């Protein structure tokens, strides 16, 4: 039986799992403004990453449950979990699988010290044997739930240094349907440019394994336009977009610039003229952008007001409110707000000017 990965149109595009960013409120906006019939088989959503250990006790599960809520409009959607305890990963993934996700992804790339010190996230890169056991435990949990959903892994090219030839083959020995590679080491964080040239070597390793595993590249992707060019140039099956989606819930359904425009201007020197770059945030009229920001704020307050600080929304405000006259002053006022009603007042006052 085919899993959802095998039914995707190529190239496909993935929403990166980002803590306090890709929550149900932001994914709701991305689904509403970014998904449609034409691209539904080309866009995959990820949840925020969730602690398997936390899901294994009653209090923790209650506290984390909002991170695993999703709507049908978001499908296909993958739940990402992290942990270094096989028993807890099995138990947690049995629960996660029962919620109806299309797949489960294991985080083996987060460089945060609090995660790495547990042996989880990028800490797995230093312990390939445990990493393989964790993949097996996740499959066991899914089976215990009576489900048949695929398992994928998101990782990096190495820990302190590039270790593709030793680390990636260990993952390929296990039953994974897709492999997402953040093209930096854990030590590099996001401080250096992602090395997309590594994709070729990883593709060769997958081919050598004899398995049908999809390869997803991640790192420094500006938008869908940039993602398509990277797929064409490097040959990956899909691309994951992280920071490029901030403040741009329209991103996944944007048109792309012509090949000639792209080659002439390049991703790093765009002037974002609407006719040239229909995928840019600037292609959206300012009033609409601010109204969608307000809608996002209201939905956040409705769905997550009891679970998260309102300050979480302020990183979104910084992204929505950028690149136009008066943006700085508007951001300052938005940073002082404490609820959606206050945001509405600030936005309305600005639009009256």
Residue ranges of each PLM-predicted region?
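Glycine-rich, positively charged N-terminal anion/phosphate-binding segment
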Residues: 2-3, 18-95
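Short glycine-enriched, charge-decorated loop/helix-capping segments at active-site entrances
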Residues: 64, 119-125, 188
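Active-site beta-loop-alpha junctions enriched in small/polar residues
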Residues: 18-20, 50-52, 82-84, 109-111, ...
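Conserved phosphate-coordination/catalytic loops
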Residues: 83, 125, 129, 193, ...
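Alpha/beta catalytic cores of nucleotide-metabolism and tRNA/nucleoside-modifying enzymes
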Residues: 1-9, 13-19, 146, 165-178, ...
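Hydrophobic faces of well-ordered beta-strands that scaffold small-molecule active sites
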Residues: 13-16, 45-47, 77-81, 104, ...
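Alpha/beta enzyme core
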Residues: 35-37, 90-104, 108-118, 129-213
């Amino acid at each position: 039986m085919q899993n959802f990965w095998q039914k995707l149109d190529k190239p496909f595009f993935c929403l990166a799992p980002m803590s306090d960013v890709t929550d149900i409120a932001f994914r709701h906006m991305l689904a509403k403004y970014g998904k449609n019939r034409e691209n539904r088989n080309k866009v995959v959503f990820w949840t925020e990453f969730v602690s398997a250990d936390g899901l294994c006790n009653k209090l923790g599960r209650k506290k984390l449950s909002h991170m695993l809520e999703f709507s049908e409009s978001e499908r296909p959607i993958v739940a990402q979990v992290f942990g270094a305890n096989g028993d807890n990963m099995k138990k947690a993934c049995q629960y996660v699988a029962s919620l109806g996700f299309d797949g489960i992804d294991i985080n083996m790339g987060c460089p945060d010290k609090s995660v790495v010190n547990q042996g989880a996230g990028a800490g797995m890169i230093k312990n390939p044997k445990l990493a393989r056991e964790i993949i097996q435990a996740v499959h066991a949990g899914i089976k215990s739930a009576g489900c048949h959903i695929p398992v994928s892994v998101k990782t990096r090219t190495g820990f302190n240094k590039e270790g593709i030839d030793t680390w990636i083959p260990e993952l390929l020995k296990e039953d994974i349907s897709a492999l997402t590679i953040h093209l930096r080491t854990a030590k590099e964080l996001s401080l250096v440019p992602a090395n997309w040239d590594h994709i070729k070597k990883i593709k060769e390793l997958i081919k050598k394994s004899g398995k049908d595993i999809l390869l997803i590249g991640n790192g420094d992707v500006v938008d869908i336009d940039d993602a398509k060019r990277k797929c064409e140039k490097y040959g990956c099956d899909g691309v994951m977009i992280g920071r490029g989606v901030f403040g741009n819930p329209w991103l996944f359904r944007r048109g792309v610039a012509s090949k000639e425009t792209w080659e002439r201007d390049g991703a790093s020197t765009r002037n974002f003229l609407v006719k040239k770059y229909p995928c840019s945030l600037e292609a959206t009229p300012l009033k609409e952008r601010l109204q969608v920001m307000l809608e996002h704020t209201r939905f956040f307050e409705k769905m997550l007001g009891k679970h998260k600080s309102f300050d979480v929304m302020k990183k979104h405000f910084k992204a929505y409110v950028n690149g136009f006259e008066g943006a700085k002053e508007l951001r300052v006022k938005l940073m002082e707000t404490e609820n959606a009603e206050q945001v509405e007042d600030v936005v309305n006052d600005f639009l009256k000017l």
